């Protein structure tokens, strides 16, 4: 059997998200330590990118982010 040489072109699209718009963002601050919490809750905090107490990040207000916030809401302060 003869080998076929196939070339595959990968096409990537980069979606730019603007986090700076006022009405579609959520500001999240870690107010309690996540040490000693459930592993899934720790992973959620790490997934949000929060590293230490009083660390704040802004996110685009999506259902995925809202679900993560709801899971660990007892550790966070959320502002619109």
UniProtKB/Swiss-Prot annotation:
Per the record, the domain of life is: Bacteria
Report the record's disulfide bonds. none
Q: Which keywords fit this entry according to its UniProt record? A: Ribonucleoprotein, Ribosomal protein
| Stored CDD domains | Ribosomal_L30
- The answer to whether UniProt assigns keyword Membrane to this entry is no
GO-annotated molecular function = structural constituent of ribosome
Q: Which GO terms describe its biological process?
A: translation
GO cellular component terms given for this protein: cytosolic large ribosomal subunit
Which Pfam family is one of those matched by this entry? Ribosomal_L30
Of which family is this protein a member?
Answer: Belongs to the universal ribosomal protein uL30 family.
Quaternary assembly:
Part of the 50S ribosomal subunit.
- Its recorded name reads Large ribosomal subunit protein uL30
Source organism per UniProt: Vesicomyosocius okutanii subsp. Calyptogena okutanii (strain HA)
